[in-house]
Protein backbone atom coordinates (compact mmCIF):
# COMPACT_ATOMS: atom_id res chain seq x y z
CA UNK A 1 0.00 0.00 0.00
CA UNK A 2 1.33 3.43 -0.97
CA UNK A 3 1.58 5.97 1.83
CA UNK A 4 -0.48 8.36 -0.29
CA UNK A 5 -3.36 5.85 -0.14
CA UNK A 6 -3.32 5.58 3.66
CA UNK A 7 -6.39 7.21 5.22
CA UNK A 8 -6.22 5.98 8.84
CA UNK A 9 -3.92 4.28 11.31
CA UNK A 10 -5.22 0.81 10.49
CA UNK A 11 -4.20 1.41 6.87
CA UNK A 12 -0.72 2.39 8.02
CA UNK A 13 -0.46 -0.85 9.98
CA UNK A 14 -1.31 -2.74 6.79
CA UNK A 15 1.39 -0.82 4.92
CA UNK A 16 3.92 -1.66 7.63
CA UNK A 17 2.92 -5.32 7.60
CA UNK A 18 3.56 -5.48 3.85
CA UNK A 19 7.01 -3.91 4.22
CA UNK A 20 8.34 -5.63 7.34
CA UNK A 21 9.16 -9.31 7.85
CA UNK A 22 6.93 -10.99 10.41
CA UNK A 23 9.67 -10.96 13.08
CA UNK A 24 9.79 -7.15 12.89
CA UNK A 25 6.09 -6.40 12.44
CA UNK A 26 5.08 -8.65 15.32
CA UNK A 27 7.62 -7.00 17.62
CA UNK A 28 5.80 -3.69 17.07
CA UNK A 29 2.26 -5.03 16.92
CA UNK A 30 2.36 -7.68 19.63
CA UNK A 31 1.72 -7.66 23.36
CA UNK A 32 2.42 -9.82 26.38
CA UNK A 33 1.10 -13.37 26.99
CA UNK A 34 -2.31 -13.84 25.32
CA UNK A 35 -2.56 -10.13 24.40
CA UNK A 36 -5.71 -9.54 26.44
CA UNK A 37 -4.35 -6.19 27.64
CA UNK A 38 -3.68 -5.23 24.04
CA UNK A 39 -7.32 -5.82 23.16
CA UNK A 40 -8.56 -4.20 26.36
CA UNK A 41 -6.69 -0.99 25.57
CA UNK A 42 -8.81 -0.51 22.47
CA UNK A 43 -12.05 -1.73 24.04
CA UNK A 44 -11.73 0.81 26.86
CA UNK A 45 -12.41 3.67 24.46
CA UNK A 46 -15.80 2.18 23.60
CA UNK A 47 -17.00 2.73 27.16
CA UNK A 48 -17.18 6.47 26.48
CA UNK A 49 -19.22 8.33 23.88
CA UNK A 50 -18.70 11.96 22.95
CA UNK A 51 -21.67 14.30 23.38
CA UNK A 52 -21.60 16.78 20.47
CA UNK A 53 -22.83 20.38 20.76
CA UNK A 54 -24.01 22.27 17.68
CA UNK A 55 -24.88 25.82 16.58
CA UNK A 56 -21.50 26.97 17.89
CA UNK A 57 -19.06 29.07 15.85
CA UNK A 58 -16.16 26.64 15.39
CA UNK A 59 -14.69 28.13 12.22
CA UNK A 60 -11.46 28.93 14.07
CA UNK A 61 -10.22 26.02 16.16
CA UNK A 62 -6.88 25.77 17.93
CA UNK A 63 -5.22 22.57 19.11
CA UNK A 64 -2.51 24.54 20.94
CA UNK A 65 -1.43 22.82 24.15
CA UNK A 66 0.88 23.85 26.97
CA UNK A 67 2.88 21.07 28.62
CA UNK A 68 5.39 21.55 31.43
CA UNK A 69 5.78 25.25 30.67
CA UNK A 70 6.18 24.95 26.90
CA UNK A 71 3.77 25.43 24.02
CA UNK A 72 2.99 22.68 21.52
CA UNK A 73 0.78 22.63 18.45
CA UNK A 74 -1.49 19.76 19.48
CA UNK A 75 -2.38 17.63 22.53
CA UNK A 76 -0.57 14.51 21.35
CA UNK A 77 2.93 13.22 20.76
CA UNK A 78 5.13 10.21 20.13
CA UNK A 79 5.99 8.01 23.10
CA UNK A 80 9.39 6.32 23.59
CA UNK A 81 10.09 3.20 21.56
CA UNK A 82 13.34 1.26 21.63
CA UNK A 83 15.34 -0.05 18.66
CA UNK A 84 13.33 1.88 16.06
CA UNK A 85 16.34 1.65 13.77
CA UNK A 86 15.74 -2.08 13.44
CA UNK A 87 12.55 -1.35 11.51
CA UNK A 88 14.02 1.38 9.31
CA UNK A 89 17.57 2.78 9.55
CA UNK A 90 17.51 6.31 10.96
CA UNK A 91 13.94 5.93 12.24
CA UNK A 92 14.55 7.71 15.55
CA UNK A 93 15.70 10.91 13.86
CA UNK A 94 12.92 10.65 11.29
CA UNK A 95 10.42 10.58 14.15
CA UNK A 96 12.18 13.50 15.85
CA UNK A 97 12.05 15.61 12.69
CA UNK A 98 8.42 14.70 12.00
CA UNK A 99 7.39 15.71 15.52
CA UNK A 100 9.29 18.98 15.18
CA UNK A 101 7.55 19.71 11.89
CA UNK A 102 4.16 19.24 13.55
CA UNK A 103 5.17 20.99 16.77
CA UNK A 104 4.44 18.06 19.09
CA UNK A 105 6.61 16.17 21.60
CA UNK A 106 8.77 13.24 20.58
CA UNK A 107 10.08 11.20 23.50
CA UNK A 108 13.35 9.55 22.52
CA UNK A 109 13.95 6.21 24.20
CA UNK A 110 17.30 5.67 25.86
CA UNK A 111 17.22 2.37 23.93
CA UNK A 112 17.06 4.18 20.59
CA UNK A 113 19.41 3.46 17.71
CA UNK A 114 20.24 7.14 17.20
CA UNK A 115 21.66 9.29 19.98
CA UNK A 116 19.92 11.93 22.05
CA UNK A 117 22.73 14.26 20.92
CA UNK A 118 21.67 13.86 17.28
CA UNK A 119 17.99 14.26 18.09
CA UNK A 120 18.60 17.47 20.04
CA UNK A 121 20.68 18.82 17.18
CA UNK A 122 17.84 18.26 14.72
CA UNK A 123 14.74 18.85 16.90
CA UNK A 124 15.74 20.68 20.10
CA UNK A 125 12.36 22.27 20.86
CA UNK A 126 10.23 19.14 20.79
CA UNK A 127 12.51 16.26 21.85
CA UNK A 128 12.14 14.80 25.34
CA UNK A 129 14.24 11.93 26.74
CA UNK A 130 13.21 8.68 28.44
CA UNK A 131 15.34 6.59 30.80
CA UNK A 132 15.03 3.43 32.90
CA UNK A 133 16.40 2.79 36.34
CA UNK A 134 19.50 0.62 35.88
CA UNK A 135 21.24 -1.89 38.14
CA UNK A 136 24.33 0.31 37.98
CA UNK A 137 22.94 3.69 38.97
CA UNK A 138 26.02 5.38 37.51
CA UNK A 139 24.58 4.71 34.06
CA UNK A 140 21.26 6.32 34.98
CA UNK A 141 23.09 9.32 36.42
CA UNK A 142 25.28 9.72 33.36
CA UNK A 143 22.29 9.59 31.01
CA UNK A 144 20.73 12.37 33.08
CA UNK A 145 23.99 14.35 32.97
CA UNK A 146 24.04 14.11 29.19
CA UNK A 147 20.41 15.17 28.92
CA UNK A 148 21.09 18.19 31.15
CA UNK A 149 24.09 19.19 29.05
CA UNK A 150 21.93 19.10 25.92
CA UNK A 151 19.15 21.21 27.49
CA UNK A 152 16.51 18.52 27.05
CA UNK A 153 13.19 20.02 28.14
CA UNK A 154 11.54 17.02 29.80
CA UNK A 155 12.90 13.80 31.30
CA UNK A 156 10.71 10.71 31.49
CA UNK A 157 11.41 7.83 33.89
CA UNK A 158 9.79 4.50 32.94
CA UNK A 159 8.95 2.39 36.00
CA UNK A 160 6.71 -0.41 34.68
CA UNK A 161 9.41 -2.85 33.54
CA UNK A 162 10.64 -4.50 36.77
CA UNK A 163 10.94 -7.87 35.02
CA UNK A 164 11.07 -9.13 31.46
CA UNK A 165 7.75 -9.81 29.76
CA UNK A 166 6.71 -13.02 28.03
CA UNK A 167 6.00 -11.78 24.52
CA UNK A 168 4.86 -14.90 22.76
CA UNK A 169 4.94 -13.59 19.21
CA UNK A 170 8.63 -12.77 19.64
CA UNK A 171 9.27 -16.24 21.02
CA UNK A 172 7.58 -17.90 18.06
CA UNK A 173 9.24 -15.68 15.45
CA UNK A 174 12.78 -15.93 16.78
CA UNK A 175 13.16 -12.33 17.97
CA UNK A 176 15.80 -12.67 20.66
CA UNK A 177 19.17 -11.34 21.74
CA UNK A 178 21.57 -12.06 20.23
CA UNK A 179 19.70 -12.35 16.95
CA UNK A 180 20.30 -15.73 15.32
CA UNK A 181 19.83 -16.19 11.59
CA UNK A 182 17.72 -19.34 11.77
CA UNK A 183 16.09 -20.75 8.61
CA UNK A 184 12.79 -19.22 9.73
CA UNK A 185 14.31 -15.76 10.17
CA UNK A 186 16.09 -16.03 6.81
CA UNK A 187 12.85 -16.98 5.06
CA UNK A 188 11.07 -14.04 6.67
CA UNK A 189 13.80 -11.72 5.40
CA UNK A 190 13.62 -13.14 1.88
CA UNK A 191 9.88 -12.50 1.84
CA UNK A 192 10.50 -8.77 2.39
CA UNK A 193 13.50 -7.92 0.16
CA UNK A 194 13.21 -4.12 0.44
CA UNK A 195 13.49 -4.24 4.22
CA UNK A 196 16.23 -6.88 4.13
CA UNK A 197 18.40 -4.92 1.69
CA UNK A 198 18.18 -1.80 3.86
CA UNK A 199 18.95 -3.86 6.94
CA UNK A 200 22.02 -5.48 5.39
CA UNK A 201 23.23 -2.22 3.82
CA UNK A 202 23.43 -0.70 7.29
CA UNK A 203 25.43 -3.63 8.65
CA UNK A 204 22.68 -5.67 10.30
CA UNK A 205 21.80 -5.25 13.98
CA UNK A 206 21.72 -1.50 14.72
CA UNK A 207 23.66 0.02 17.61
CA UNK A 208 21.86 1.39 20.67
CA UNK A 209 23.78 4.65 20.47
CA UNK A 210 22.83 6.11 23.85
CA UNK A 211 24.30 3.06 25.55
CA UNK A 212 27.45 2.77 23.43
CA UNK A 213 29.67 4.74 25.87
CA UNK A 214 29.02 2.27 28.68
CA UNK A 215 30.00 -0.89 26.78
CA UNK A 216 33.66 -0.06 26.30
CA UNK A 217 35.80 0.83 23.32
CA UNK A 218 35.24 -1.36 20.28
CA UNK A 219 31.93 -2.76 21.53
CA UNK A 220 29.68 -4.27 18.89
CA UNK A 221 25.93 -3.71 18.60
CA UNK A 222 25.37 -7.08 20.27
CA UNK A 223 27.77 -6.13 23.09
CA UNK A 224 25.79 -2.96 23.74
CA UNK A 225 22.48 -4.83 23.57
CA UNK A 226 23.82 -7.40 26.04
CA UNK A 227 24.82 -4.63 28.44
CA UNK A 228 21.37 -3.07 28.17
CA UNK A 229 19.82 -6.48 28.83
CA UNK A 230 22.02 -6.94 31.89
CA UNK A 231 21.30 -3.50 33.35
CA UNK A 232 17.56 -3.50 32.65
CA UNK A 233 15.23 -4.58 34.08
CA UNK A 234 16.48 -3.67 37.54
CA UNK A 235 14.18 -5.78 39.77
CA UNK A 236 15.68 -4.52 43.04
CA UNK A 237 14.83 -0.88 42.38
CA UNK A 238 12.46 0.91 44.75
CA UNK A 239 11.09 4.41 45.15
CA UNK A 240 14.69 5.39 45.83
CA UNK A 241 15.27 5.48 42.07
CA UNK A 242 12.70 8.25 41.71
CA UNK A 243 14.29 10.10 44.63
CA UNK A 244 17.69 9.77 42.95
CA UNK A 245 16.45 10.95 39.56
CA UNK A 246 14.48 13.84 41.05
CA UNK A 247 17.56 15.05 42.90
CA UNK A 248 19.72 14.86 39.77
CA UNK A 249 17.27 16.34 37.26
CA UNK A 250 16.39 20.03 37.62
CA UNK A 251 13.73 20.21 34.92
CA UNK A 252 10.26 18.75 34.45
CA UNK A 253 10.20 15.06 35.42
CA UNK A 254 7.50 12.69 34.17
CA UNK A 255 6.99 9.17 35.53
CA UNK A 256 5.72 6.69 32.94
CA UNK A 257 3.85 3.49 33.75
CA UNK A 258 1.55 4.51 36.60
CA UNK A 259 -1.82 2.73 36.95
CA UNK A 260 -2.55 2.87 40.69
CA UNK A 261 -3.79 6.11 42.29
CA UNK A 262 -1.63 5.51 45.37
CA UNK A 263 1.45 5.33 43.14
CA UNK A 264 0.34 8.55 41.47
CA UNK A 265 0.15 10.26 44.85
CA UNK A 266 3.56 8.87 45.81
CA UNK A 267 5.05 10.32 42.60
CA UNK A 268 3.45 13.66 43.43
CA UNK A 269 4.82 13.55 46.97
CA UNK A 270 8.33 12.84 45.65
CA UNK A 271 8.33 15.80 43.32
CA UNK A 272 7.34 14.42 39.91
CA UNK A 273 5.82 17.05 37.65
CA UNK A 274 3.74 14.67 35.57
CA UNK A 275 2.68 11.09 34.90
CA UNK A 276 2.02 8.93 31.91
CA UNK A 277 -0.91 6.68 32.77
CA UNK A 278 0.21 3.59 30.88
CA UNK A 279 0.29 -0.20 30.77
CA UNK A 280 3.24 -0.11 28.37
CA UNK A 281 0.95 -0.65 25.40
CA UNK A 282 -0.17 -4.01 26.76
CA UNK A 283 3.39 -5.32 26.60
CA UNK A 284 4.14 -6.01 30.29
CA UNK A 285 1.20 -7.39 32.34
CA UNK A 286 -1.65 -9.02 30.46
CA UNK A 287 -4.07 -8.63 33.35
CA UNK A 288 -3.37 -4.93 33.82
CA UNK A 289 -6.28 -2.53 33.40
CA UNK A 290 -6.48 -0.25 30.40
CA UNK A 291 -5.06 3.21 31.09
CA UNK A 292 -8.34 4.79 29.98
CA UNK A 293 -10.08 2.92 32.80
CA UNK A 294 -7.64 4.28 35.38
CA UNK A 295 -7.23 7.82 34.04
CA UNK A 296 -10.31 9.32 35.76
CA UNK A 297 -9.39 7.63 39.05
CA UNK A 298 -5.85 9.00 38.92
CA UNK A 299 -7.03 12.43 37.77
CA UNK A 300 -9.35 12.57 40.77
CA UNK A 301 -6.54 11.48 43.12
CA UNK A 302 -3.99 14.08 42.03
CA UNK A 303 -6.58 16.83 41.70
CA UNK A 304 -4.80 18.93 39.10
CA UNK A 305 -1.55 19.10 41.07
CA UNK A 306 0.45 17.47 38.28
CA UNK A 307 0.08 17.13 34.53
CA UNK A 308 -1.32 13.83 33.27
CA UNK A 309 -0.49 12.19 29.98
CA UNK A 310 -1.72 8.83 28.77
CA UNK A 311 -0.69 6.21 26.23
CA UNK A 312 -1.67 2.71 25.08
CA UNK A 313 -4.20 2.04 22.35
CA UNK A 314 -4.64 5.42 20.65
CA UNK A 315 -5.69 5.07 17.02
CA UNK A 316 -8.20 7.89 16.38
CA UNK A 317 -8.57 11.60 16.97
CA UNK A 318 -11.70 10.78 18.94
CA UNK A 319 -9.56 8.66 21.30
CA UNK A 320 -7.50 11.74 22.10
CA UNK A 321 -10.64 13.78 22.71
CA UNK A 322 -11.96 11.22 25.18
CA UNK A 323 -8.67 11.21 27.09
CA UNK A 324 -8.72 15.00 27.38
CA UNK A 325 -12.27 14.85 28.70
CA UNK A 326 -11.12 12.45 31.44
CA UNK A 327 -8.30 14.67 32.65
CA UNK A 328 -5.27 14.09 30.41
CA UNK A 329 -3.36 17.07 29.04
CA UNK A 330 -2.11 15.04 26.08
CA UNK A 331 -2.05 11.55 24.61
CA UNK A 332 1.05 9.69 23.43
CA UNK A 333 1.18 6.88 20.91
CA UNK A 334 3.92 4.51 19.80
CA UNK A 335 2.73 1.82 17.42
CA UNK A 336 1.07 4.22 14.94
CA UNK A 337 4.26 6.26 14.66
CA UNK A 338 6.38 3.13 14.28
CA UNK A 339 4.07 1.76 11.61
CA UNK A 340 4.39 5.05 9.77
CA UNK A 341 8.15 5.38 9.91
CA UNK A 342 8.64 1.70 9.02
CA UNK A 343 6.33 1.84 6.02
CA UNK A 344 7.29 5.26 4.70
CA UNK A 345 10.20 6.77 6.56
CA UNK A 346 9.86 10.39 7.64
CA UNK A 347 6.97 10.90 5.22
CA UNK A 348 5.15 7.98 6.83
CA UNK A 349 5.69 9.42 10.31
CA UNK A 350 4.37 12.79 9.13
CA UNK A 351 1.35 11.08 7.59
CA UNK A 352 0.48 9.51 10.95
CA UNK A 353 0.75 12.84 12.76
CA UNK A 354 -1.36 14.50 10.08
CA UNK A 355 -4.06 11.83 10.41
CA UNK A 356 -4.30 12.44 14.15
CA UNK A 357 -4.27 16.21 13.67
CA UNK A 358 -7.00 16.19 11.05
CA UNK A 359 -9.20 13.70 12.90
CA UNK A 360 -8.89 15.62 16.15
CA UNK A 361 -9.76 18.87 14.37
CA UNK A 362 -12.93 17.31 13.00
CA UNK A 363 -13.88 16.01 16.43
CA UNK A 364 -13.35 19.48 17.89
CA UNK A 365 -15.76 20.85 15.31
CA UNK A 366 -18.40 18.28 16.15
CA UNK A 367 -17.98 18.94 19.87
CA UNK A 368 -18.30 22.70 19.55
CA UNK A 369 -14.76 23.24 20.86
CA UNK A 370 -12.57 26.09 19.68
CA UNK A 371 -9.72 25.19 22.06
CA UNK A 372 -8.64 22.01 23.81
CA UNK A 373 -9.32 23.40 27.27
CA UNK A 374 -13.05 23.06 26.60
CA UNK A 375 -12.82 19.27 26.88
CA UNK A 376 -14.23 17.97 30.14
CA UNK A 377 -16.23 15.16 31.74
CA UNK A 378 -19.51 16.87 30.82
CA UNK A 379 -18.63 16.20 27.17
CA UNK A 380 -18.77 12.42 27.68
CA UNK A 381 -21.42 9.77 28.13
CA UNK A 382 -20.03 6.94 30.26
CA UNK A 383 -21.87 3.79 29.21
CA UNK A 384 -20.81 2.10 32.46
CA UNK A 385 -22.50 4.89 34.43
CA UNK A 386 -24.92 6.70 32.11
CA UNK A 387 -25.73 10.31 32.93
CA UNK A 388 -28.16 12.81 31.40
CA UNK A 389 -26.58 14.44 28.34
CA UNK A 390 -27.25 18.00 29.61
CA UNK A 391 -26.38 19.50 32.97
CA UNK A 392 -29.12 21.06 35.05
CA UNK A 393 -27.63 24.53 34.78
CA UNK A 394 -27.43 24.38 30.99
CA UNK A 395 -29.72 26.98 29.35
CA UNK A 396 -30.68 24.53 26.63
CA UNK A 397 -32.14 21.21 27.78
Model-derived regions, located:
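Short, charged beta->alpha transition segments
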Residues: 60-69, 94, 107-119
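Alpha/beta catalytic cores of nucleotide-metabolism and tRNA/nucleoside-modifying enzymes
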Residues: 1-46, 293-310, 315-397
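A gly/proline- and charged-residue-enriched helix-loop-helix capping module
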Residues: 100-122, 126-140
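Alpha/beta enzyme core
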Residues: 83, 97, 122, 138-310, ...
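Short beta->alpha linker loops
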Residues: 32-33, 110-114, 135, 259, ...
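Glycine-rich active-site/cofactor-binding loop and its immediate structural neighborhood
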Residues: 73-111
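An N-cap/entry alpha-helix motif that binds or orients negatively charged groups
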Residues: 1-70, 178-237, 373-375, 381-397
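Short, conserved beta-strand segments within well-ordered enzyme catalytic domains
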Residues: 49, 64-66, 75-79, 105-107, ...
